[in-house]
Amino acid sequence: NRQESGNRTAPSAMNRQDVKIYICTKNASYLYDHKAHAMIPVNDGDVRPADAPICLILVTDTAEPWAAMDAGIVSQNISLFCSGTGLATYPRASMNKDALAKTLKLTSLQTPMLCHPVGYKK
């Protein structure tokens, strides 16, 4: 994100900026607040759907017509950043979405769209 302007790095359809990023670690889950550049605690415990040190869960509002496309744009930015900094990641859609939605305290209109396990290259 661009702290100087408050804008996000990834564009979105009609500038909706509806993709929420949750950071899941071994000990807790957080919601990333892009305006404050802060991680807001959501819960304790390990809910990572993969074994990587962290998993980034991209959550979208299913009422937004461009939600899947916006999640794809954010996903590409995550992949490019990780590649450029020597980290390993890959986007995946396979995860227990119902369990994650409950654990992350999502609304009925929000859904986990993509997961990015992030770790070190082997």
Residue spans for each PLM region:
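Solvent-exposed coil/turn segments that connect beta secondary-structure elements
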Residues: K26-A28, K35-H37, D61-A63, M95, ...
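Small-aliphatic-rich amphipathic alpha-helix that forms the alpha element of a beta-alpha
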Residues: I21, L56, T60-K102
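Glycine-rich loops and low-complexity Gly/Arg-rich segments
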Residues: D46-P49, L80-C82, L114-P117
